[in-house]
From Swiss-Prot:
It holds the Pfam family Ribosomal_L16. It comes from the Bacteria. Part of the 50S ribosomal subunit. Binds 23S rRNA and is also seen to make contacts with the A and possibly P site tRNAs. One of its GO terms (biological process) is translation. Keywords: Ribonucleoprotein, Ribosomal protein, RNA-binding, rRNA-binding, tRNA-binding. One of its GO terms (cellular component) is cytosolic large ribosomal subunit. The keyword Flavoprotein does not apply. GO terms for molecular function: rRNA binding; structural constituent of ribosome; tRNA binding. This is Large ribosomal subunit protein uL16. Belongs to the universal ribosomal protein uL16 family.
Length: 137
C-alpha cells in the first residue's frame, strides 16, 4: 500500500477540504481517466483496492497511473479507551481529494473496456466519480 517513506511530522490535524482542484484536474499520461466529483478522504487501502479491480479487469492489456497519493496520517485511539491522555497513534494514511481531481488514468485499451474497468474501480471509492476521455486525438 502507498504511504510516505518519511514525513516531517508524525501526526496531522484533521483539517477540512475546501474548494476545487486546479492542479491534477486534467489528463497527463493516459487516454482515459477517473475524475472525482466531490470532496473526499480516500484511504491507501481504497486506492489499492480500486487499482486492483481496474488492473484485473483489463487483464494484461493497457497501463494504469495512480494520480493521488495518501500523504496525511490519521490517528486513532484503541477501542474502549477513555478520552484524554493525548492523541492516538497514526493508524492509516489518507489522500485529501477535491472535486475535479483526476484519480486514475489508463491507456492501451479500448474505450468500452476502460469504462467498465473504471466503473469497477469507482465502486471501491467513497466519492462520486466521472469517466473522462482525452480531447482531440
Amino acid at each position: 500500500m502507498l504511504q510516505p517513506k518519511k514525513t516531517k511530522f508524525r501526526k496531522a490535524h484533521k483539517g477540512r477540504v475546501h474548494g476545487l482542484a486546479y492542479r491534477g484536474s486534467s489528463l497527463s499520461f493516459g487516454q482515459f481517466g477517473l475524475k472525482a466529483m466531490a470532496t473526499a478522504r480516500i484511504t491507501a487501502r481504497q486506492i489499492e483496492a480500486a487499482r486492483r479491480a481496474m488492473t484485473r479487469h483489463i487483464k494484461r492489456g493497457g497501463r494504469v497511473w495512480i494520480r493521488i497519493f495518501p500523504d496525511v496520517p490519521v490517528s486513532q485511539k484503541p477501542a474502549e479507551v477513555r478520552q484524554g491522555k493525548g492523541k492516538g497513534s497514526p493508524e492509516f494514511w489518507i489522500a485529501r481529494v477535491k472535486p475535479g481531481r483526476i484519480l486514475y488514468e489508463m491507456e492501451g485499451v479500448d474505450e468500452q473496456l476502460a469504462r467498465e474497468a473504471m466503473q469497477r474501480a469507482a465502486a471501491k471509492l467513497p466519492v462520486k466519480t466521472k469517466f473522462i476521455v482525452r480531447e482531440g486525438g
